[in-house]
Each structure stands twice: as structure tokens, then as C-alpha cells.
Design a protein with these regions (language model features):
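RNA/tRNA-interacting regions in translation and RNA-turnover enzymes
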Residues: 182
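Hydrophobic alpha-helical transmembrane segments
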Residues: 1-173, 177, 185-319
Length: 319
């Protein structure tokens, strides 16, 4: 039943994604983070105090998320096994973000193909932290490919990994870790202290999934008739060409698979950030690379699901 729940939840994510008006735990987690952040900022004033307060905030948000998920699942199972199964499916479904990621990328791709740079930049600003107002088509393509590659880990592989380790409650806790990082894990002055713990522990949580993405995306490249050997080589060679210990693994692998170059300088919060280049410019990046990256993402996520189902079946059987 558990393995069936995994499959059903994954299929639901592929088919319907995250309908905008449905209740979603990430929105609730986001509200909890905002409340916690306000409390911490009201109580803590020095940089050291903000770091400690940020650590307490991380413990409260992730711990409460896990506890509520575990309690709701246990209660549902106590009422009826089938209700417990449905709740488990719903929880897993909400931590997966494949279709949402693909739709967001398509929302940027469509106006870009139509030559509407203003609309494409506007849609891109919803999914990246960089300044999009002056980006040219190649820069937009690069930003979308980087986002899809990186979030293949955050949105699919890592949630499935923690699902394997600790079931739906731990996958929900991972989502809280990831949401904390996306909301407060920045290096600029406003968040540097309060978000330090969230940023570093997100790096820890994604350490193994990011490295696993190197293998999964390389195999996906072979299955998608991209250059799997170059994906494997480039993913390994450029794995540390990023300020994050994890982001370059999927980005470099995708860059190698497609024969394009990612990274480079970008503007964040009004500041120019010089990033290393990732991959080799075998050819210029093009709008078609967005669709090709989405395809790599879906195949890699399918491989991740199959791998984790196989591992769980080997460890505990079909229960």
C-alpha cells in the first residue's frame, strides 16, 4: 500500500500539479515562517542573537511540520486504513513539484518564442531571484534551464529521498527545510544572520540528493538521446563551480547533456554577482533547451521514483 501511495502521488503531480486554489502545506509552512521570523526579529537585535533565533526558528518550523504531519497521518490511520492511505497520498503529492516546475518554465518559454520579452521577463521573475528587467533571450533561456535543473533536486529527487528515509512526515519536514531556505536563506544583509542556519541545513539536506542527481540526470540524458557521457563528465568536472555545494551538480550535468554553458554573471538585489561558468559552449543556448531540460527533469524523476521504490521493496517488502 505504501509503494502504491508513492506511485499514485507521483502520477497526480504529473497530471494535475498544484492547482492554485487548493489547500497546500507549503503555504501553511510559509505563514508559520513569517510569524516565526517576526517574533525572532522582535526579540533578537544583535547579529549573534539573530543567528541563534534563526536556529530556533528552524527547529520550530521543521519540528512542528514533522509532528503535525505524523499526528495527522496517525489519526487518519486510526480512523480507517484507507483514510490513512489517502492522507499519505495527499501529503506525498504536495511535496512533489514536477508539474509546477514544468509549467513555470513553459510560462517563460511561450512568450519568449513569441518574441514578447517583457512578458517572458515578468514570468521569469516569479521563479528566480536575479534581476530580470534587462535580460536578453539567451540570458532568459539560461536562467530557466538553471532553475529547472536545480529544482529537479529540490522539487522531486530530494522529497522522494526523504520519503524513502522516513515516510511522508519526513518528506514534509524536508519541504519545511527547503521553504525556510527559499524564504530566509539569503546572503544579503537583511537575511544573512537570521537565515544562516536555514541556508546551511538546506545544504546538508540536499547533499546526497544533489549528488544522486548527477547520476540520474546523466542516465536521463542517455534515455532522452542527449549526450550522456558528456553529462557525466561535465557534471563531475564542474560540480563545485557554484557558491552552493549542491547546485552545480544538476546544473553542470544538464549543461553537459545539452552542450551549453550555464552560470556566469547575474544581478541579485541590485548587486552584480560574478559566478563561474558551468559547462562548455559546444553551441549557443536556445529556447528549445527549455523543453529539453524539462524532458530530462521528468525522466530523471521517473528514475528516482523507480530507484527508491526498488530500495524500499528490497529493504522491507511491499508493505
Amino acid at each position: 500500500m505504501t509503494l502504491l501511495a508513492w506511485c499514485v502521488a507521483w502520477i497526480l503531480d504529473v497530471v494535475i500539479g498544484d492547482p492554485p486554489h487548493w489547500p497546500h502545506p507549503v503555504r501553511w509552512i510559509g505563514r508559520l515562517i513569517n510569524i516565526s521570523q517576526c517574533v525572532v526579529r522582535r526579540v533578537c537585535h544583535s547579529e549573534r542573537a539573530l543567528r541563534i533565533g534563526g536556529g530556533v526558528m528552524w527547529l520550530v518550523v521543521t519540528g512542528l511540520t514533522w509532528a503535525v504531519a505524523w499526528g495527522v497521518l496517525a489519526l487518519a490511520r486510526g480512523i480507517h486504513p484507507w483514510l490513512g492511505w489517502l492522507v499519505e497520498v495527499w501529503m506525498i503529492f504536495t511535496v512533489l513539484a514536477g508539474r509546477c516546475l514544468a509549467q513555470s518554465a513553459r510560462d517563460v518559454e511561450r512568450p519568449l518564442r513569441a518574441g514578447d520579452l517583457a512578458e517572458s521577463r515578468s514570468k521569469l521573475s516569479w521563479i528566480v531571484g536575479r534581476d530580470t528587467t534587462q535580460l536578453q533571450p539567451q540570458q532568459i533561456n539560461r536562467a530557466v534551464v538553471e532553475t529547472v535543473a536545480e529544482n529537479t533536486v529540490d522539487g522531486i529527487i530530494a522529497p522522494l529521498f526523504f520519503l524513502l528515509l522516513g515516510g511522508a512526515p519526513l518528506a514534509m519536514a524536508y519541504k519545511a527545510v527547503n521553504t525556510l531556505d527559499s524564504m530566509v536563506g539569503y546572503k544579503h544583509e537583511k537575511y544573512r544572520a537570521i537565515g544562516m542556519v536555514s541556508a546551511r541545513l538546506d545544504d546538508v539536506a540536499n547533499f546526497l540528493p544533489a549528488r544522486l542527481s548527477w547520476l540520474l540526470l546523466s542516465l536521463a540524458a542517455v534515455l532522452c538521446r542527449e549526450d550522456g557521457a558528456r553529462a557525466l563528465r561535465t557534471g563531475w568536472r564542474d560540480r563545485y563551480q557554484h557558491s552552493s555545494p549542491n547546485c552545480a551538480w544538476p546544473e553542470a550535468t544538464v549543461a553537459g547533456a545539452l552542450g551549453i554553458r550555464l552560470g556566469g554573471p547575474n544581478d541579485y538585489f541590485g548587486q552584480r554577482v560574478e559566478k563561474p561558468w558551468i559547462g562548455d559552449a559546444v553551441r549557443d543556448i536556445a529556447v528549445d533547451d527549455i523543453s529539453r531540460t524539462i524532458r530530462l527533469m521528468w525522466v530523471a524523476s521517473s528514475l528516482a521514483l523507480a530507484l527508491f521504490i526498488g530500495v524500499r521493496y528490497w529493504l522491507v517488502g511491499a508493505a
